Amino acid sequence: MLVKSYAAAVQGISATVITIEVNCTKGIQFFLVGLPDVAVRESHERIISALQVSGYKFPRNRIVINMAPADIRKEGSSYDLPLAIGILAAAEELDASRLGHYMMMGELSLDGSLKPVKGILPIAIKAREEGFKGFIVPKQNAREAAVVNDLDVYGVSTIKEVIEFIAGRRDLEPTVVNTREEFYARQLQFEADFSDVRGQENVKRALEVAAAGSHNLILIGPPGSGKSMLAKRLPSILPPFTLQESLETTKIHSVAGKIGLDTSLMTQRPFRSPHHTISNVAMVGGGAFPQPGEISLAHNGILFLDELPEFNRSVLEVMRQPLEDRTITVSRARLSVDYPANFMLVASMNPCPCGYYNHPDRPCLCSPGAVQKYMNRVSGPLLDCIYIQVVVVQLPFENISYGRSSECSEAIRERVMKARAIQEKRFAAHEGIYSNAQMTSKLLHEYAVPDAAGLSLLKVAMQRLNLSARAYDRILKVSRTLADLEASPNIEACHLAEAIQYRSLDRETWGT
């Protein structure tokens, strides 16, 4: 008997329906075709054991299984469940008429229990688009899939539950998630707050500007000056996720298997902080069977690179194109996939190998050549992509005393959100543009025109600091954000002066 069950394959962050055709006839052979990988071919043994433990027998017939379309590679063990159900239906131990209503995914253990799988959210979205009545998934994945409206999601623990449900001998209750209620309830819960940081008001101001305009940022300073502490509090002043942003980001983390068990939607912007030994592929994504990298996992959030010069130079250079395009294309012989990469880059570094160049109290042990060599580990074009460059200094005791109060993240976030609201209104007619950092050259000429005094100041700065055309654009974008923070429709000289101050690596002559 020929029957069909349905699953899906994930490519990039979208899914494609996989039709599993099972034909059971007289004979004793087992064939699995349709470009399955090793893990899929090994499902034969898992299915036999799972069915036996659950009280069912694997059919002693000639079984031919085709996973269509055949040009898409099927990877992983997530097809175990639809394969097993299809085999039972083809052997006439199940009513095959109900299989067409449901999509199924799940890895089988030898005892018949189901293990969670990756990529459930994009698969659930595809199941709804294709008109399936329900989606049967491991219980741990149910809440993640249930955020998709107009689709009944059934979380199950064993294959026996699925068999009895398809046979009509068991009722399963769909998993229900109040997406909006859960999303908004946990949106503003942060472990770290800017009130924890004493002093460093100029750096906090720079972080506020970066958050308001989604500008890339680098902090340069000696060890122990608070660079990492400040950077890790940046998510607490970013505007909260919109529901659409949360769905986009959750899809990426779902594909990468980074969603926590029994989790529905991500409620806070991601903060990714990879180690400096990371490889090119782990950073931008790829591999023989492409997976999203750190830049995509940081989509709609922050990618924090601590000790920037310690990263392999090739790793830093491959980030330049995604920083500009806000997407990354991974091409392989059989397919090409696109991953979103709209992240805010935040980096930190010491000013020299020993960390104490220009320190007021501790002597630097590095030669001028060593300092220059250290700084040159980060290329000029990459630094041009970093809008705000700030020197973090060691603070005296008076400034870090716990007796001094410090502004909390909530107060800063309110100002940031007001500036972002101005930008959203400004760019409402421009699809894909939401912040000042995303402005094109055309939009710069329209919305970031300084007054006469500001233009004169900028001309002098360009000449004295020998700034590139790219740095010129960055200064204008940051100036536009500074004006938005003051709700000023015009960019004035004071805004440009502050923006120029945030080009520390252009203003300083390191190692001389």
Model regions and ranges:
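Short loop/turn elements that form and flank the Walker-type P-loop nucleotide-binding site
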Residues: 26, 58-61, 98-99, 131, ...
